[in-house]
Amino acid sequence: MNLPHIKDDAMPAKENRIIYSHIGLEGWNASIEKYLSDGGYAVLAETVKRPREELCAEVEKSKIKGRGGAGFPTGTKWKFLDRKSGKPIYLICNADESEPGTCKDRLLIYQDPHKIIEGIMCACYAINAAQAFIYIRGEYINGYRILQKAIAEARERGFVGKNICGSDYCCDITVSRGAGCYVCGEETGLISSLAGGRAYPRIKPPYFPAVKGLYDCPTAVNNVETVCWIPEIFKRGGEAVSKIGCPADPGTHVWGVSGLVQKPGRYEITTGECTLGELLHDLCGGPLPGRRFKAIIPGGSSMKILRWDEKFTVKNAD
């Protein structure tokens, strides 16, 4: 596989921290005071004043895709919600990060929980959800406690619960811990578990979550990273977001790198602006001294192992 080091005369690959804007900042903590000091919940306060149809249209114009792996356009997913059923609409934030070695959402949960909460509440208002749920990986015990505390802080300040930001909109968030079941990464399996049943994926159709989801009600299931994009879309505008990075998959993606590299970690990179070789050499510092790359697992343990000397072709922008 040809993964050449970036040329000396080219601009080195850099991060573009939008979702990770607070991660690793000196003096930053998970408190609501710190989040408010950087303009936190300002987008939510403006969101509840805007027409819902306009907000959903902005998400569709942004072309932002789900960050959980399936890559389905978020605006299209919301468009499928059955708003005429007379049943309540639910939103589930999928924080069941169970792919071995994956922990991109964990950083947001532990260090920036209020960004997640603001994203959830902005999304809930846009789709007129009656209740939101966060389904968190069972092993994230401290993360569960951090989210519970953050939600209580937000509720006390009027950002969650009744009359959000002084409006007539009411919506609360419930956090539910999983039990270490890998299949809950699939949305219908997650819904079955959240409803108290066995975490078993359901047949589509008829069980499209947008039509027949949690408690057989219309349900939107969005990943942690995805909901964090919602305030950015409402603040910047859908068209502006659609111009960030690759047109087929706008925005940024958080990439986690582990193994024998000099700087393992999570890196937020604009789509289409960094090759795998640049990520490994420039951002991660290359292999440890005296070691060399032999193979790469590009998407977790469920993917094919790519040999270092193997040649391959990327067939599309995704």
Give residue ranges: language-model regions.
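Iron-sulfur (Fe-S) cluster-binding modules
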Residues: 1-62, 129-134, 278, 290-291
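Short coil/turn connectors at secondary-structure junctions
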Residues: 15, 53, 61, 85-89, ...
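Gly-rich Lys/Arg/Thr-decorated short loops/hinges at beta-loop-alpha junctions or inter-strand turns
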Residues: 35-41, 93-105, 211-214, 255-262
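Small-residue-enriched alpha-helical segments and adjacent helix-cap loops
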Residues: 54, 65, 133, 137-183, ...
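Conserved phosphate/anionic-ligand binding catalytic regions in large, soluble enzymes, centered on
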Residues: 61-81, 180-192, 196
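Histidine-anchored nucleotide/phosphate-binding helix
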Residues: 112-126
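Short amphipathic, charge-patterned alpha-helical segments
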Residues: 119-123, 272-289
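Hydrophobic alpha-helical positions that pack around
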Residues: 144-271, 283-286
